[in-house]
């Protein structure tokens, strides 16, 4: 018996080179349009980013826009503020303010309580000293304090500040002495910078 004759088959293509898309053309076109629309929707979405604060809950960031037609989300207590501020700090400053916004001076008890908060232990002494100086020279301006304006109290100007804790007044001689020190320090700094610049230039010339 003779050997069976083998028939030659054409070589099969390599599977790794087959990159034919099995999706119909119409379905592929519809899928591309849907993906483009979804991408545009994600880009146009005005979702505010989330900010991690000291609070355990995530809060959205409020966007501040300068355009008058844009509406900015705000709380009910922020409607009287001219610009974004911290409400707690704003109320704290209002509580410590010795004079009201209408220019009316506060009562001595309230002023004493404010001074006791600002400088504990010196409130009574500063009040007694201010009263004695007012009786002694009512029109003479006191160093370190605002002069009183004739014609009524001025908002924020008729309140006398407590004396510094150190009790040392700054004189014109002190100012001139400090100015001389600053001038000498600047001259030394300029000389040091000039010497460093010359040294670097010499090093570059010798190295080149």
From Swiss-Prot:
Chief place of localization: nucleus
A Gene Ontology term for the protein's cellular component: nucleus
Assigned protein family: Belongs to the MBD3L family.
Designated name of the protein: Methyl-CpG-binding domain protein 3-like 2
Complex formation: Interacts (via N-terminus) with MBD3; the interaction is direct. Interacts with MTA1. Interacts with HDAC1. Interacts with HDAC2. Interacts with RBBP4. Interacts with RBBP7.
InterPro entries: MBD2/MBD3_p55-bd, MeCpG-bd_2/3_C_dom
UniProt keywords, alphabetically: Nucleus
Positions of the UniProt region annotated as Interacts with MBD3: 1-89
Extra remark beyond the main annotation: The MBD3L proteins are encoded by strongly repeated regions of the 19p13 chromosome. The exact number of functional copies is unclear, and some of them may represent pseudogenes.
Protein's cellular compartments: Nucleus
């Amino acid at each position: 018996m003779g050997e069976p004759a083998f028939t030659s088959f054409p070589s099969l293509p390599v599977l790794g080179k087959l990159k034919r898309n099995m999706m119909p053309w119409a379905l592929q076109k519809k899928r591309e349009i849907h993906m483009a629309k979804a991408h545009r929707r994600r880009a146009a979405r005005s979702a505010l980013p989330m900010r991690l604060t000291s609070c355990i809950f995530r809060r959205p960031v409020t966007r501040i826009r300068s355009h008058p037609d844009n509406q900015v989300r705000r709380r009910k207590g922020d409607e009287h503020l001219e610009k974004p501020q911290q409400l707690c700090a704003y109320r704290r400053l209002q509580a410590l303010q010795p004079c009201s916004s209408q220019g009316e001076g506060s009562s001595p008890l309230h002023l004493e309580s404010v001074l006791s908060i600002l400088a504990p232990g010196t409130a009574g002494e500063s009040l007694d000293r201010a009263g004695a100086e007012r009786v002694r020279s009512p029109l003479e301006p006191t160093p370190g304090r605002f002069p009183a304006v004739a014609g009524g109290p001025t908002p924020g100007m008729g309140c006398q500040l407590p004396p510094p804790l150190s009790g040392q007044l700054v004189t014109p001689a002190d100012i001139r002495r400090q100015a001389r020190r600053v001038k000498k320090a600047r001259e030394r700094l300029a000389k040091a910078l000039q010497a460093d610049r010359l040294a670097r230039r010499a090093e570059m010339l010798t190295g080149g």
